[in-house]
């Protein structure tokens, strides 16, 4: 999923268990690449075939991703909220596709998944302005994920069911948000990825 507005995020949480309040963004964006034979291809809007909302309320993005040598593979990304919790489940599925233009199912591909995080009220934007030296120290790495605790009482926990987490801190500055630009608001935000 792409980001067009400051209100777009993988997860916007209501941090109060007692009453509704402004949403808080900590898990902003998810960037994904397909890796096959040392060739990476970003899973982006260019590859998007369609989008659907499933009967259970989850959202599914279906991608047709080039893998090299004129071949492709189909990947589905599903995002669902867990009822009653500030929890989002993200899952990937490689579709079983056949045909001369598809990579054979027995040829493995890997996914590189890079989450971008923030710590803000959903009405604001993140500006790095010194956070580059603070946020890396707020991340606790684990074999399959990390905990990001930017302030007491707020922790984002990301855990993968398989694979491994590779620490590789990166800031993306001036992430363009066209909806804010159209409204005459500051169209830029900064995001941090622990790895």
Label for each model-derived stretch:
Residues 1-195:
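Terminal accessory carbohydrate-recognition/targeting modules of carbohydrate-active enzymes
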């Amino acid at each position: 999923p792409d980001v067009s507005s400051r209100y777009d995020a993988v997860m916007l949480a209501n941090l109060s268990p007692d009453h509704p309040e402004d949403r808080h963004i900590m898990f902003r964006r998810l960037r994904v690449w397909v890796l096959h034979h040392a060739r990476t291809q970003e899973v982006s809007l260019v590859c998007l075939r369609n989008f659907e909302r499933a009967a259970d309320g989850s959202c599914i993005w279906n991608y047709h991703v080039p893998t090299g040598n004129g071949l492709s593979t189909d990947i589905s990304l599903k995002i669902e909220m867990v009822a009653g919790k500030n929890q989002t489940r993200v899952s990937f599925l490689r579709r079983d596709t056949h045909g001369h233009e598809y990579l054979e199912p027995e040829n493995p591909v890997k996914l590189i998944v890079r989450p971008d995080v923030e710590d803000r009220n959903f009405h604001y934007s993140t500006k790095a302005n010194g956070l580059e030296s603070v946020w890396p120290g707020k991340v606790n790495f684990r074999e399959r994920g990390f905990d990001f605790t930017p302030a007491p009482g707020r922790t984002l926990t990301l855990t993968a069911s398989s694979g491994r987490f590779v620490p590789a801190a990166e800031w993306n500055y001036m992430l363009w948000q066209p909806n804010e630009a159209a409204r005459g608001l500051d169209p830029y935000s900064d995001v941090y990825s622990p790895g």
